[in-house]
C-alpha cells in the first residue's frame, strides 16, 4: 500500500499503535491574501520574509488596512496556527522529535526561545496584525479579510474553506484574487523556509473491551473504516 506510515507517529508508543489517523491532510497555518491588494502595494505575491511583510505594513497602515488579520481569542490559535510553524523554522524537525521522545530537547532551548521572541516581536513591536488579535477569534479575523479590511489572513485550512465558500458567490472579483502562501521566514531562522505544519491530532481507536465480543468488534472496525 502507499499509505504513509509516518501518519501513525502521534499515536504510536513503544512500537504499539493506539489509533488510526482520521485527519491526514490540511494545514493549521495557511496565509490567504488578496493578490490585487498586494499588487497595489508593490508585491507580485505574498512576501517570503517577515521583513518584507513589515515593509508592506507601512503601505497598508497608511490606507487604514490591516496587513494580516489574526485571531487568538480562543487562546489556541497562536500555538496551532502560528507558533507550530514558526517554531519549526528555528528548531527544525529533529528538535521536535527529540521533544516527543523525551530525548533531550526542551522548551528552554535557545532555538525555541528565539522563536518565542520573534513571535512576540511580530505581534507587539510591529504593526502587521490587527490590534485586537488577542481578543477576536479566527472566525472574527477571517471576516476582516472577507470585508476587505485586511489584506491577508492567517489561519487553518478550515478557515480557507469558509472564506472560499463565503466569497464564491458573494464577491467573484475577490474570490478570483485569493492567493495562498506559506508562513514567511524570520531573518534569523535557519531551518527550511517552506516548512509547513499539518493537522494530525485526530485518530479513530477501537475500545479494547470489544476484544471479547467478535461481533461488536467487527461492527466497530466496519464503522471506523
Q: Model features per residue range: what roles?
A:
Residues 41, 126, 168-225:
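Extracytoplasmic/periplasmic substrate-recognition and gating elements
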Residues 1-30, 54, 60, 81, ...:
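Hinge/lid segment of periplasmic solute-binding proteins
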Residues 1-12, 36-48, 143-144, 151-152, ...:
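Extracytoplasmic "Venus flytrap"/periplasmic binding protein-like
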